[in-house]
């Protein structure tokens, strides 16, 4: 750096500082005090972060993220539905993202209760709930038990219901050893595991000829690492061993089930193909060749189908 450049930079800095002191005190006052995030306190005192955009009198669309991510996973869909005139809401599940990293309560009953508390706090009525993967299980558990008038419709994308893990009653499910492997990998090196998942099966980037998005991989890792290891560890049991059979049977509202046919994380035969048979008012649409994270890799396609369902 030359002496002349140094003098110029000093003068620029001095000018900026002088300009700051000429700002109205009302503007400066806006920056005083701690910055706060939008949160609600649930019935057990857990702080849940949420985003709430759009007209408060518009129909709400509530987005439920997958494991181990956050509400940010729905940014594309939130902006899309916002542009279509909806009120859009996304929360970070307890222990995930910006929500409180509590030690306990990482199970579907607590997840659904947190959603109920959020819906009550924001006075959400006639809402459309859209859930991906673990978030689809959360939607099923919540909608099946929701207060009258709260829910209009639901959509399950690459969702885990009715139940993932193999058992005597679910012999073609995913072996428990697979989920034990998830837990071991997370405990050993969560940062590396959270790179391996999105760069491999989650978006289908391990398939020959796949168009890999480095941005999606990094964003998945960013979201995952912002949450708590305890919540993520316990959450594996929540999404793999929870049985949603009775929840699906109890739902009376219209439900759209969307699933990628090349989903390597939540195989379609053990999820969507079974779930649709349990729903009273369900519609199934599948996508040849698409992966578990299909709404992120093909947002225009999925957004159009979700919007058509919302308007139907």
Spans of model-derived segments:
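N-terminal export signals
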Residues: 2-3, 9-29
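Conserved hydrolase catalytic core segment
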Residues: 126-165
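Catalytic active-site module of serine/aspartate enzymes centered on a nucleophile-bearing elbow/loop
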Residues: 282-312
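Short beta-strand/loop motif that positions the catalytic acidic residue
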Residues: 251, 257-259
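Conserved alpha/beta-hydrolase "acid-adjacent" motif
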Residues: 264-270
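Conserved alpha/beta-hydrolase catalytic His-Asp/Glu region
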Residues: 162-174, 184-249
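Active-site loop/oxyanion-hole signature of alpha/beta-hydrolase fold enzymes
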Residues: 83, 90-134, 296, 304
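Conserved HGGG/HGGXW glycine-rich cap/lid loop of the alpha/beta-hydrolase fold
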Residues: 46-101
